[in-house]
Amino acid sequence: RSPTECVQTAQADITVQTAVLEARFLAGSAGLFAQMQAQLAEVAEPAQFLQGKLAEQAKRHAKFGPSPYALEPNCKESPGALRDLHLLYWGMRMADLCSADTRFWQAAVDAQLLDAQEAQNLAQSWAFIASVRCHLHQLAGREEDRLLFDWQIPLARAMGYAHHEVSSASGTSIYTRSASAAFMRDYYAAIKLGLQMLE
């Protein structure tokens, strides 16, 4: 397709527009790539794009449940998960506040949308959830985004979590915290941050 055809297709389909927005030059004609990006920027309608992405988000949240604290959450599609973090990035890209080559959380600090600590927390949450998804795919041997109970213990171990005893001040063992419980606690903390950033 020509740059013009890519932009026309993107205007008609928000999924294609999102893909073009995320595109990075890897090989081929840098001039054609730059032309496509420039043409998309000329016709972009950030408010309409964001409304479309928010409508997608509402459908996704309805499908996967409104609570981010599902016992077997989807690390890509559930509330606060990767797609919600992507929405923040896409909004920044569409508003021309960052490029594909910049870390959007740093651009959010530069634009005074986040302070440095919020940006650092967002970056850590994004990295954690992305790591969860990559480990899950590796363990499953295929694309799998659901943190099913059967995956939670091996996933916790793969990510370095271990069972440990919690003791009282006198040294008496109170209970044993499982690796999967500690892992899921950290997962829920990461997605909670994603939801807070969207508010």
Residue ranges and their predicted role:
Residues 1-199:
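A nucleotide- and high-energy phosphate-metabolite-utilizing enzyme signature
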